[in-house]
Design a protein with these regions (language model features):
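A structural micro-motif at secondary-structure boundaries
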Residues: 2-28, 32, 91-93
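Positively charged, aromatic-enriched patches within helix-turn-helix-type DNA-binding elements
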Residues: 18-23, 29-64, 73-76, 87
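A short linear beta-strand->loop->alpha-helix hinge motif most characteristic
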Residues: 79-93
Length: 93
């Protein structure tokens, strides 16, 4: 369970009640990484640990993926608080 949601790694479905959402591999990696650590992670940490990019690389990959994942979750589950951000860090509380 992740904040009241279930994640099936085999089917890649993220669900709560009767609602289910198909996730990509990267979306699953983001959720598992943010949930496992229980701390705020800045963009550089996510770039390095999920994408393997160096911290000094200029990219908006993390922000774009997190934005799209938040939107998918918000659109289906009406949950705008699943992935939180604070001072350039992302976390699941």
């Amino acid at each position: 369970m992740i904040k009241g949601y279930e994640l099936n790694l085999n089917s890649k479905f993220f669900f709560k009640g009767n609602l289910k959402l198909k996730l990509t591999e990267k979306e699953i990696e983001i959720i598992l990484y943010l949930n496992d650590k229980k701390i705020k992670h800045n963009v550089e940490k996510l770039q390095k640990n999920i994408w393997g990019y160096s911290a000094d690389m200029e990219t908006h990959t993390v922000e774009t993926h997190v934005y799209r994942l938040r939107k998918k979750i918000s659109d289906l589950f009406k949950d705008e608080q699943f992935i939180l951000s604070h001072k350039n860090g992302y976390f699941i509380d």
